[in-house]
Amino acid sequence: MDLHRAAFKMENSSYLPNPLASPALMVLASTAEASRDASIPCQQPRPFGVPVSVDKDVHIPFTNGSYTFASMYHRQGGVPGTFANRDFPPSLLHLHPQFAPPNLDCTPISMLNHSGVGAFRPFASTEDRESYQSAFTPAKRLKNCHDTESPHLRFSDADGKEYDFGTQLPSSSPGSLKVDDTGKKIFAVSGLISDREASSSPEDRNDRCKKKAAALFDSQAPICPICQVLLRPSELQEHMEQELEQLAQLPSSKNSLLKDAMAPGTPKSLLLSASIKREGESPTASPHSSATDDLHHSDRYQTFLRVRANRQTRLNARIGKMKRRKQDEGQREGSCMAEDDAVDIEHENNNRFEEYGWCGQKRIRATTLLEGGFRGSGFIMCSGKENPDSDADLDVDGDDTLEYGKPQYTEADVIPCTGEEPGEAKEREALRGAVLNGGPPSTRITPEFSKWANDEMPSTSNGESSKQEAMQKTCKNSDIEKITEDSAVTTFEALKARVRELERQLSRGDRYKCLICMDSYSMPLTSIQCWHVHCEECWLRTLGAKKLCPQCNTITAPGDLRRIYL
C-alpha cells in the first residue's frame, strides 16, 4: 500500500516537486548546469527506487535510466555537509528522504525542503506559514541588476511589471549599503542566492543578476505610459531623460507664443480668448497633442493677423480718401463762412444799432439789439430778390402749322343740321352767323352731289324712319331723276361723272369703307387729334351737330381736318 501510494503521488501533478513548475527556477537550474565545472566530481546516477527487500513487482515511475535524479536535479559535487561547490542551494530540492540520494544534505532551513512543503509536509503553525515566501512569485526586488555608474532601484510585482526608480544613491553612502544588505538578507531567506553567490565577488554577482533579470523580464517588456512605446530595460533611463526634456520644453514654447501674442497692436479680446483657451486646456492631455495644438493655433493666429492687417489697410485707405474729401469741403466752407462773416461784420459795423428819431429824440431800434434781427427773433422775412423772368415762349393755342400745314377747313365749311323745331334752327343759325362774322357760307358740298337724301340727320324712331325710308332716294336714283329734269348737257355731264365714280370704285375694289355712311370713301379726311378717317361729308355734318369725333368722341375742330389720299 505504501508503494502504491507513493507511486500515485509521484504520478499526480499535485504531488510533484513544486519548484519545477516555476520558470524562474528552471532558468536558474539550466544556468547552473551550463556554468558548472566538468572537473567537479559527480555522484553516480541513481534511479528512483524502493528498498531491495520488496519482492512484489509494482509500477514505480522514473524507473528508466534516463529519468535519473541527476537528470532532473543537477548533480551535487563536493564533500557531503559542505555547500561550497553547489550550483544552487539544496533548499530548492523538494524530495522526500526516501527518494533523495544518500549524499544529499537537506538540513538547511528553507521553505522548499521536505520539512516545509510537499505531500509529506507536517502541519505547521500560522506564524510559520505567514513568515514563508512563495516560490511561485518573482522576487520583490533584485539587487545589483544595474550598471555601477548609474545605480537604480528596480522593483517588479507579481504580474511581471518592472518599476524603475531613478534615485541616484552613491555606492559609498549608508543608504546604498543598507539597501545591499537588506536585499542580500531577503534573497538569502527566500533561497534565491546560493552560498557561492554570497561568497563570490561583486562583479560575478552583477553578471549573474543581469542574466537572471533578463530572463525574468524578457517575457514582458515595459511600455512608456506617455507615448506608449515598447522599451527595453537598457533604454528606460535614456527614454526617461527624453521625456523630461520634452516636458521642460513645453513651458518655453507656451511662453514664446504668449510673447508673440503680446506684440503691439494685438487687441485685448484676442489676448483674453488666448488666456481662456490656455486655462480651458485639459490637464490630462499628452504633451505631444498639446504641442501640435499649439503649432496649429500659432498657424491660425498668423493667418488671422495677416487677414486683419489687409482689412485694416483697405479700411484705412477708404477712410483717408473720405478725410481728404471732408478736408477739402471744410476748407471751401471755411472760406465761404469767412467771407460771409466779413460781410456780416461790415454790415453790423455800419448798422450796428439802428437809430431813429421820435419826438425830437434819438432812439435805438429794438430789433437791432437781437442777434440776427427779425430772422433771429423768429419772424419770417421775405427776400428782396426777384426771380428772373424766363424768356421761353408758352404755346397755349397749340399751333400745328409747322407740323401739319395750314388748316384746310374752317367753320364756314361745316354743314349745319336742321332741327325739328323752328326755334332751335333759328338759334343755330344765329350762332353760326356770330362765328362766321357775317361771312358767306362755303359751297364745298352742294345738295345736288350730297350723299344724304335730305338735310336732316337720320332719326332713330321707327315711324319717322319708315317715312324717311319711303321718301329717301339713293344717290343713283336722285342723279337719274335730276338728269331727266335738266337739259341734255347736264345729263351728259352727270353720266360722265357717274362713269368716273364707277371706274374709281372698280379700281379701288371697295377695299375701304367709311364707318359713318358704310360706303366707299368719296373724299377721305382725317383728324390730327385722333387720326380717324371718314368721308368729307360725314365729317362736316357731324361737326355741324357737335364738335366731337363720330367714332371716339374726341373734341375736334374744323381746322383739325386734313385731306388724305388712299
Swiss-Prot record:
<comment type="pathway">
    <text>Protein modification; protein ubiquitination.</text>
</comment>
<feature type="region of interest" description="Disordered">
    <location>
        <begin position="277"/>
        <end position="297"/>
    </location>
</feature>
<dbReference type="GO" id="GO:0005737">
    <property type="term" value="C:cytoplasm"/>
</dbReference>
<dbReference type="GO" id="GO:0090263">
    <property type="term" value="P:positive regulation of canonical Wnt signaling pathway"/>
</dbReference>
<keyword id="KW-0479">Metal-binding</keyword>
<dbReference type="InterPro" id="IPR040178">
    <property type="entry name" value="RNF220_RING"/>
</dbReference>
<feature type="zinc finger region" description="RING-type">
    <location>
        <begin position="514"/>
        <end position="553"/>
    </location>
</feature>
<dbReference type="GO" id="GO:0061630">
    <property type="term" value="F:ubiquitin protein ligase activity"/>
</dbReference>
<keyword id="KW-0832">Ubl conjugation</keyword>
<dbReference type="GO" id="GO:0008013">
    <property type="term" value="F:beta-catenin binding"/>
</dbReference>
<dbReference type="GO" id="GO:0005634">
    <property type="term" value="C:nucleus"/>
</dbReference>
<keyword id="KW-0597">Phosphoprotein</keyword>
<comment type="function">
    <text>E3 ubiquitin-protein ligase that promotes the ubiquitination and proteasomal degradation of SIN3B. Independently of its E3 ligase activity, acts as a CTNNB1 stabilizer through USP7-mediated deubiquitination of CTNNB1 and promotes Wnt signaling. Plays a critical role in the regulation of nuclear lamina.</text>
</comment>
<feature type="coiled-coil region">
    <location>
        <begin position="485"/>
        <end position="513"/>
    </location>
</feature>
<keyword id="KW-0833">Ubl conjugation pathway</keyword>
<feature type="cross-link" description="Glycyl lysine isopeptide (Lys-Gly) (interchain with G-Cter in SUMO2)">
    <location>
        <position position="277"/>
    </location>
</feature>
<dbReference type="InterPro" id="IPR013083">
    <property type="entry name" value="Znf_RING/FYVE/PHD"/>
</dbReference>
<dbReference type="GO" id="GO:0004842">
    <property type="term" value="F:ubiquitin-protein transferase activity"/>
</dbReference>
<dbReference type="GO" id="GO:0051865">
    <property type="term" value="P:protein autoubiquitination"/>
</dbReference>
<keyword id="KW-0808">Transferase</keyword>
<feature type="modified residue" description="Phosphoserine">
    <location>
        <position position="390"/>
    </location>
</feature>
<dbReference type="Pfam" id="PF15926">
    <property type="entry name" value="RNF220"/>
</dbReference>
<dbReference type="InterPro" id="IPR031824">
    <property type="entry name" value="RNF220_mid"/>
</dbReference>
<keyword id="KW-0963">Cytoplasm</keyword>
<dbReference type="GO" id="GO:0005652">
    <property type="term" value="C:nuclear lamina"/>
</dbReference>
<dbReference type="GO" id="GO:0008270">
    <property type="term" value="F:zinc ion binding"/>
</dbReference>
<keyword id="KW-0863">Zinc-finger</keyword>
<keyword id="KW-0539">Nucleus</keyword>
<dbReference type="InterPro" id="IPR052443">
    <property type="entry name" value="E3_ubiq-ligase_RNF220-like"/>
</dbReference>
<keyword id="KW-0175">Coiled coil</keyword>
<dbReference type="Pfam" id="PF13923">
    <property type="entry name" value="zf-C3HC4_2"/>
</dbReference>
<dbReference type="InterPro" id="IPR001841">
    <property type="entry name" value="Znf_RING"/>
</dbReference>
<protein>
    <recommendedName>
        <fullName>E3 ubiquitin-protein ligase RNF220</fullName>
        <ecNumber>2.3.2.27</ecNumber>
    </recommendedName>
</protein>
<feature type="region of interest" description="Required for targeting to the cytoplasm">
    <location>
        <begin position="514"/>
        <end position="522"/>
    </location>
</feature>
<comment type="subunit">
    <text>Interacts with SIN3B. Interacts with CTNNB1 (via Armadillo repeats 2-8). Interacts with USP7 (via MATH domain).</text>
</comment>
<keyword id="KW-0862">Zinc</keyword>
<keyword id="KW-1017">Isopeptide bond</keyword>
<dbReference type="GO" id="GO:0016567">
    <property type="term" value="P:protein ubiquitination"/>
</dbReference>
